């Protein structure tokens, strides 16, 4: 089942000159998106500077967004990390705040194997069993590609892995992935 249909907007995280999050401006951005019929908000993804925020800022930004959006549209929180335990901690927190789904980027820099990806995503999903997870496949940024068979395996075997944000641009890979997943995986482009 789709978490949303239509357009999910990856929100920037506005900052002051000193590098602190500008929550007043973030609220303006959120209100503008909702007023203009955005179907879902994606917070703390690549566009949201997730890799440059401290864990505290990251979680504060997610909580602020969930509170301000207040269920008017789904909020998908980016909680991925190259460290499985960090991703679990961030995911549990975001789930406790009421995130509608979690966006989990592949581990970056260390180039996980497909077996490693299965272990990583399964551990995170098992830590937040009631919260839908969307895998985020952006190998141009992470150096790690979720292969079609891996995505299909996870979708079929881990109940709350429900989708993939597929950013490879490889249409043959995407077609194969969706075929292997046999209707068990929602596809989000990005």
Regions found by a protein language model. Name each.
Residues 2-9, 13-145, 153:
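Active-site beta->alpha loop and helix N-cap motifs at the rims of alpha/beta catalytic domains
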């Amino acid at each position: 089942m789709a978490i949303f249909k239509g357009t999910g907007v990856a929100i920037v995280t506005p900052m002051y000159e000193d590098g602190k999050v500008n929550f007043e401006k973030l609220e303006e951005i959120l209100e503008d998106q909702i007023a203009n019929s955005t179907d879902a908000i994606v917070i703390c993804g690549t566009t949201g500077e997730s890799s440059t925020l401290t864990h505290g800022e990251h979680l504060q930004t997610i909580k602020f967004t969930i509170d301000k959006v207040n269920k008017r549209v789904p909020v998908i929180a980016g909680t991925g990390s190259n460290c499985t335990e960090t991703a679990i901690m961030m995911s549990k927190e975001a789930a406790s705040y009421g995130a509608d789904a979690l966006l989990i980027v592949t581990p970056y820099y260390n180039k996980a194997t497909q077996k490693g990806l299965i272990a990583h995503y399964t551990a995170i999903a098992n830590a937040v069993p009631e919260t839908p997870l969307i895998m985020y496949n952006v190998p141009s940024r992470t150096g790690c590609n979720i292969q079609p068979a891996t995505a299909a395996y996870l979708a079929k075997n881990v109940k709350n892995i429900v989708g993939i944000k597929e950013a490879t641009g490889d249409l043959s890979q995407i077609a194969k992935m969706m075929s292997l997943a046999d209707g068990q995986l929602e596809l989000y482009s990005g």
